[in-house]
UniProtKB/Swiss-Prot annotation:
Keywords: Disulfide bond, Glycoprotein, Hormone, Secreted, Signal. InterPro entries: 4_helix_cytokine-like_core, Somatotropin/Prolactin, Somatotropin_CS. The keyword Glycoprotein applies. This is Placental prolactin-related protein 4.
Amino acid sequence: MAPAPSFHGHQWTYNLVRGSCLLLLLVMSNLLLCQGILCPSLCPDGDDVCRASLIDLFVHASVLSTGMYNTSVKMFTDFDEQYAQGKEYFINVSDKCHTNSLHLPEDMQHNPTDEQKGLIMWILMLLYSWQRPLYQLVTDLRSMKEVSNTILSSARENVKKLKELQALIERPFSQVIFTARRKMYIARIYWFGLRSLLSSNEDRRHSAFYSLFFCLRRDTRKLDIYTKFVACRLIYKKC
């Protein structure tokens, strides 16, 4: 087995794009190594079924999260090129994301067990928070002129990937689902942007669409990075 990578403090957040790719390569390459060498940190000795299931789960989760991010980039780029050129929709746009109150667990380096649980819960909450806007994008908003064929097909892909990734993570970590839902309710992490997207005021409508696609791109980027990080933690216990 290749030696576990070492990250001190939060240095692994440096250069997110390159780091995300590196983590994916580390996770997938070492998962393949586990096919020939027992991974005692994850499964009981000799439990090949458990080992194979975990390999499939982690590889699949990483592929899904990367796919969601790439599709979200495509959606944002398509809208930006068509409707946002020369506009100032980007000003303070990050302040408008409905997931801003969804914070990463603090002091993640101090207790690996709490870190794992906290990050898995955070990932599920992020997925839950995007169910409604993505669903309404492919239903109530699909006939809007701003929702191009590219955006609509990409949104449908994201709905499918979100459901698949959510089910994949919920299956082995079902014990955190209730707490995640409860925390979202208490923090009021919900999306209420439909009215602005249906506004008769074109500039307001375009600003709302820009914010939606910007926030989706931002959040799926985080989702991709931390899904890979959790996978790395579960495999090596220390990344």
